[in-house]
């Protein structure tokens, strides 16, 4: 490929040149949501981060198989091996079938992703649809001697595995650290070691979601699904596994252990993780109860929101920070993103107003601008630098439209292509349909306000002001009609 992409590999803690295992094919697996509630801003970040990666790899000419799973079973409360299944709990509280809960929130998740202009993955497998594959994975680990059965459940033997391999190589932990921070929960007596994690859990009598297995009627542990489904759709070795930084431990650490225990080596070449979105320095999350749903952002209905924010404002807000940086929510930051996005969209609209000249003014170098955008993307998806370059492009467009600079037809064509490529195709931004409607609504409010001022002027027999307002609006193309109830107006198009 022409462009050399480097990405930060969490496993090796450094940026590495991206070299696919089977070019031009790329296999990418990203951990999707556990669907027991509405998607929030924290869900938007990995979706947008890996959407940009998907878009860019595709642009570079790779044939990407992008797998993003749906967790609809096995994810217990507090990410532990005890407690109630998150989806089953929601179903019990709402007196629904678990799959009703899954389908309802999955539909809403898809709707939110569509609003954010997140492309659909190539495959979106459900954990509940791959129970057989997870049972087969558990059996392989048992056969290899790295798991044991206990009272109908099957646990991964972390201590035994750690003698042969390194448990903790992704997160940088050692087993003693893990043991010191492992909580003493109910049911730990089934385990040989508190750090052991469930591969299969025997279902209690009241547990709704259960499947038969060689060990018990039960359900798979949370970590099993991604290893099993990644292997099924991407093979025993694939290029990229992504997710939020909060998944490094225990989820992705356990995935590596399962992979190595069942096949002798790690399935994944590059581990990529986006950082968190925080509120007042604390991670935003459903389990913490401090989240704002995407619908609440779009509608402005949450008490912490000063206003509603469009999906593209949210997307732009996320892309203005590097994906490995923490982003702290604030209305001020979102409002700044809103203004910045509007500047870019207006600049793109301004491209169509430019009349090309014979030559391009000195100091305008479109090819360099395009090269710098590529350079930023190739440097571990540095979208903030891409945006900075596009703002420089916006400055150039505004200067040309103001008559302070000129641009040749060839350079204008390149500039248009650069903006459309990086703004729309790669970063996935778009001009929202509602934006022009919103502007028209705002204009309408201004006209109403002026005509109300005119009514006051007429009531005060200030005919000069009344006529001035009417004549000004008429000159701007508005037709004003006085009625017994006040006034009517329309814009003559």
From Swiss-Prot:
A motif ('HIGH' region) lies at residues 33-43. InterPro entries: Cys-tRNA-ligase (IPR015803), Cys-tRNA-synt_Ia_DALR (IPR015273), Cys-tRNA/MSH_ligase (IPR024909), CysS_C (IPR056411), Rossmann-like_a/b/a_fold (IPR014729), tRNA-synt_1_cat_dom (IPR032678), tRNAsynth_Ia_anticodon-bd (IPR009080). SUPFAM superfamilies: Anticodon-binding domain of a subclass of class I aminoacyl-tRNA synthetases (SSF47323), Nucleotidylyl transferase (SSF52374). It is found in: Cytoplasm. It catalyses: tRNA(Cys) + L-cysteine + ATP = L-cysteinyl-tRNA(Cys) + AMP + diphosphate. GO terms for molecular function: ATP binding; cysteine-tRNA ligase activity; zinc ion binding. A motif ('KMSKS' region) lies at residues 283-287. Zn(2+) binds at residues 31, 226, 251, 255. It comes from the Bacteria. It holds the Pfam family tRNA-synt_1e. Its cofactor is Zn(2+). Belongs to the class-I aminoacyl-tRNA synthetase family. Monomer. This is Cysteine--tRNA ligase. The gene is cysS.
């Amino acid at each position: 490929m022409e462009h050399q992409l480097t990405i930060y590999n969490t496993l090796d803690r450094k940026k590495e040149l991206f070299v696919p295992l089977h070019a031009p094919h790329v296999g990418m697996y990203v951990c999707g949501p556990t669907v027991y509630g509405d998607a929030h801003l924290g869900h938007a970040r990995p979706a947008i981060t890996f959407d940009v990666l998907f878009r860019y790899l595709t642009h570079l000419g790779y044939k990407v198989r992008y797998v993003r799973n749906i967790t609809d079973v096995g994810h217990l409360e507090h990410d532990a091996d005890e407690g109630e299944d998150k989806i089953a709990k929601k179903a019990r509280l709402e007196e629904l079938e678990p799959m009703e809960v899954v389908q309802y929130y999955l539909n809403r998740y898809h709707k939110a992703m569509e609003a954010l202009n997140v492309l659909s993955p190539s495959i979106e497998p459900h954990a509940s649809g791959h129970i057989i594959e997870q049972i087969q994975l558990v059996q392989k680990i048992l056969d290899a001697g790295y798991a044991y059965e206990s009272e109908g459940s099957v646990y991964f033997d972390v201590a035994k595995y750690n003698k042969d391999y390194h448990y903790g190589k992704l997160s940088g932990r050692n087993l003693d650290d893990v043991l010191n921070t492992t909580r003493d929960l109910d049911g730990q007596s089934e385990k040989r070691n508190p750090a052991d994690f469930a591969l299969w859990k025997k279902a209690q009598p009241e547990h709704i979601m259960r499947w038969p297995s060689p060990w018990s009627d039960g359900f798979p542990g949370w970590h099993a699904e991604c290893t099993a489904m990644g292997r099924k759709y991407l093979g025993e070795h694939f290029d990229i596994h992504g997710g939020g930084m909060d998944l490094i431990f225990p989820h992705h650490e356990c995935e590596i252990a399962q992979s190595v225990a069942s096949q002798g080596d790690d399935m994944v070449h590059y581990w990529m993780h986006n950082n968190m979105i925080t509120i007042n320095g604390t991670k935003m999350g459903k389990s913490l109860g401090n989240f704002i749903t995407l619908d609440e952002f779009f509608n402005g209905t949450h008490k912490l929101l000063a206003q509603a924010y469009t999906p593209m404002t949210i997307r732009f807000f996320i892309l203005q920070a590097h994906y490995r940086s923490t982003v702290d929510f604030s209305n001020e930051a979102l409002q700044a993103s809103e203004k910045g996005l509007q500047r870019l969209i207006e600049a793109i609209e301004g491209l169509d107003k430019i009349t090309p000249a014979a030559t391009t003014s000195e100091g305008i170098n479109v090819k360099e601008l395009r090269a710098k955008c590529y350079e930023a993307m190739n440097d571990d998806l540095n979208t903030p630098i891409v945006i900075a370059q596009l703002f420089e492009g916006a400055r150039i467009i505004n200067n040309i439209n103001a008559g302070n600079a000129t641009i040749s037809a060839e350079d204008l064509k390149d500039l248009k292509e650069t903006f459309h490529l990086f703004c729309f195709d790669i970063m996935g931004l778009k001009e929202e349909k509602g934006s022009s409607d919103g502007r028209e609504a705002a204009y309408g409010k201004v006209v109403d306000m002026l005509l109300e001022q005119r009514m006051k002027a007429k009531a005060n027999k200030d005919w000069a002001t009344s006529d001035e307002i009417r004549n000004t609006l008429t000159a701007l193309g508005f037709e004003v009609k006085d009625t017994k109830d006040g006034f009517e107006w329309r814009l003559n198009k």
